[in-house]
Amino acid sequence: MLILLDQNGVLADFEHAFIDAWRKRHPDIEPVAFEDRKSFHIREDYAPELRGLAEAIYTAPGFIRDLPPVPGAIEAFRELLALGMDVRICSSPLMQFENYVAEKYLWVERHLGREATQRLILTRDKTLVQGDLLIDDRPVITGAARPRWRHIIYDAPYNRDQTDRPRLDWRNWRNVLAGELYRSDA
């Protein structure tokens, strides 16, 4: 089984690192709490006059490279490989890619090892990537093709209105994926 894992928000803890960076840069302005997030795009949860400040954080050199892992993500990645799954990291860089692309590779190398960089797929359109499952925090994924993979939502406050697909986090991933493996054998 080919499992595609999104990077930011699934493997790399973008959300909490953003809040920490916001507090350091703008101690006089309260950040939007993670549990209060409504939009997949973090800048859209801020007032228009604050969106440039938000964007300056996540496009800053070193931000993506220095993201901490989501708790349990590294262990789950390694366990899936040990179970014989073909696991790939499928990530969409921002349009402001100057730092993003290299830093995504550096993040993978730092947390998963240099060999894992060969498992990194960067694309603006995930529907063009083949796989059996895509675990992604983006609530709706559209593109040029009808995807072959089944979208499993990685749980986040901004995607909880989507109830038509399986949902997981790194605490319950074994149960959710066991159901998907059974389903694929049927």
Swiss-Prot record:
Superkingdom of the source species: Bacteria
This enzyme's EC code(s): 3.1.3.-
Gene Ontology molecular function, alphabetical: 5'-nucleotidase activity; metal ion binding
Pfam families the UniProt entry points to: NT5C
Disulfide bonds: none
Cofactor(s) named in the record: Mg(2+)
Biological function: Dephosphorylates the 5' and 2'(3')-phosphates of deoxyribonucleotides.
Annotated protein name in UniProt: Putative 5'(3')-deoxyribonucleotidase
